[in-house]
A protein has these predicted regions:
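A short acidic, Gly/Pro-enriched loop at the edge of an enzyme's catalytic core
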Residues: 1-5
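A short glycine-rich, Lys/Arg-flanked "PGG" loop and its adjoining helix->strand segment in the class I
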Residues: 12-28
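Blade/loop signatures of beta-propeller domains
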Residues: 74-106
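A short beta-strand motif characteristic of beta-propeller blades
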Residues: 102-112, 147-150, 154-157, 191-196
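Repeat-blade elements of multi-bladed beta-propeller folds
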Residues: 113-136, 158-183, 199-237
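Short loop/turn segments that connect beta-strands within beta-propeller blades
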Residues: 141-143, 186-190
Length: 238
C-alpha cells in the first residue's frame, strides 16, 4: 500500500517500476487507492511496465496487482529435486557468486542432529519447507518470514541413504507421510486440508508429485527409519 497516495492523493515516484522491483515474486500483492484519476493511476503502471494490473473506479481509484513466479525460476520439490531424481532444479536465473539473502529463524534449536541424514528442505512456488525435530516450518523463500509452523511428534524420518523422504511439495501443498496416511498441508497457511490412506496393513513410503498426480509406494507398518530418541540413532550393527 502507499500512504502518500491514500492520504495525499499523489503517486509515489514517476512510475511503478520500483514497486514492481520490490514486490515479492510468486504471490506478492500490492493494493493502491486514493484521490487520483484512474487514467493517471493506469499510466503510472504503464510507464513502469507492470503487467496484469486490475483497476476499479469509485469514490476513489483503486488498483491491485499480483506478481507471479519469476520466469525461469526453478523449484526443489523432492529429496533429489524432482520426481525424476535428477538433482537439478532447472533454474535459469542463478548465475555467478552466491550470497546470503536473509538470516534468522528458525535457527538450529528445533533442528535434528545432522548425523541422522535427515530429509532435505524443499522449495516450491516461492516457499521453503523445512523439517525440524518432529516439527515442520513453511517459510517465505524471498525474505525468510515463517508463514507457519506445525508440531508433529508422530512424524520423523532419517537415514535417507537407506530410505525415502517423508515429504514432497507442489505449488499449493506440502505432502507428509504419517504412517498409513499422507497429509496434504496448505503451503501458505499450514492447515491440514487433505488426507490419503494407504491400503490396510501398509504405510506410506516413497512419494512423488508429477503434474497433478500424487504417487506413492507402501511398506510394512513401522518399517521406516525414524531415529528413535529413546534408544539412540543407530541403524545397523555394521
Amino acid at each position: 500500500t502507499s500512504e502518500r497516495l491514500l492520504i495525499e492523493g499523489t503517486l509515489p515516484g514517476a512510475d511503478a517500476s520500483e514497486l514492481w522491483r520490490v514486490l515479492r515474486p510468486a504471490g506478492g500483492v500490492a493494493v493502491l487507492g486514493g484521490e487520483v484519476k484512474q487514467v493517471e493511476l493506469k499510466n503510472w503502471f504503464v510507464r513502469g511496465k507492470v503487467p496484469g494490473v486490475k483497476l476499479e473506479d469509485g469514490k476513489k481509484s483503486w488498483a491491485i496487482v499480483r506478481r507471479g513466479k519469476l520466469k525461469g525460476a526453478g523449484d526443489w520439490t523432492h529429496q533429489y529435486a524432482g520426481p525424476d531424481n535428477t538433482t537439478n532444479s532447472r533454474d535459469d536465473l542463478v548465475r555467478g557468486d552466491m550470497g546470503i539473502l536473509w538470516w534468522g529463524e528458525p535457527g538450529p534449536k528445533p533442528m535434528p542432529d545432522r548425523g541422522g541424514r535427515n530429509p532435505a528442505p524443499l522449495a516450491a512456488n516461492g516457499r521453503l519447507f523445512m523439517q525440524g525435530n518432529r516439527m515442520f516450518f513453511g517459510m517465505d523463500a524471498y525474505n525468510g518470514t515463517i508463514l507457519w509452523s506445525l508440531s508433529a511428534p508422530e512424524i520423523r524420518r532419517s537415514n535417507l541413504p537407506r530410505d525415502g523422504s517423508n515429504m514432497v511439495a507442489s505449488d499449493d501443498y506440502l505432502y507428509l507421510s504419517d504412517g498409513r496416511y499422507c497429509i496434504g498441508i496448505d503451503g501458505q497457511t499450514g492447515e491440514r486440508k487433505l488426507r490419503f490412506s494407504a491400503p490396510k496393513g501398509r504405510d506410506w513410503s516413497f512419494m512423488a508429485v508429477a503434474g497433478k498426480q500424487l504417487l506413492g509406494s507402501s511398506v510394512l507398518p513401522d518399517s521406516a527409519y525414524k531415529a528413535d530418541d529413546e534408544i539412540g540413532e543407530w541403524y545397523d550393527s555394521g
